């Protein structure tokens, strides 16, 4: 009677765990293994736990799949997937020059973004930003541009070039500063103009008033 109870208990535990009985040759007891399909080239070990005299329950050990080598490697910061696959370094835009003030938008575009502005008779606008509001420029000189890139001693530079051999950058920093200063002098506040023109008008009106007085 006692072996039958142990057998019933083993079958109950086996059915609850989702295992089917599997007889072992040369063993008086009974064992159970999982219903999973056999994997080619892989061996499963069994851990035996004694359930009673003359009987044992076999529980299979699950073999974890091997992880690929690339999963454990961390990507270098600042690189995209395509650049990492091709082995290309990250692109960094070199700065051509340094502006003395960031309010000078033309200098910022030229030095940091390397964008050449479009010179129009009315104003100077950066390429692709037509709605940019910039102060009106003065009259452009129709004479030939001097070929010498060395600035004169009395010319105030608006930027400093990173490379000493960059003649185009040196010419830009020396040439456009005069245009900017000219446009700054040409554009005066409205209040200042009213003060300058208001005096003579008031004196003229006062003289005419005296002439019309009886």
UniProtKB/Swiss-Prot annotation:
Disulfide bonds: 97-111, 99-107
SMART domains: END
Keyword Signal assigned: yes
Signal sequence residues: 1-16
UniProt KW Transferase keyword: no
Any one Gene Ontology cellular component term annotated for this protein: extracellular space
Keywords in alphabetical order: Cleavage on pair of basic residues, Disulfide bond, Secreted, Signal, Vasoactive, Vasoconstrictor
UniProt-annotated stretches for the region Endothelin-like: 159-173
Family: Belongs to the endothelin/sarafotoxin family.
Cited function: Endothelins are endothelium-derived vasoconstrictor peptides.
This protein's name: Endothelin-3
Source organism of this protein record: Mus musculus (Mouse)
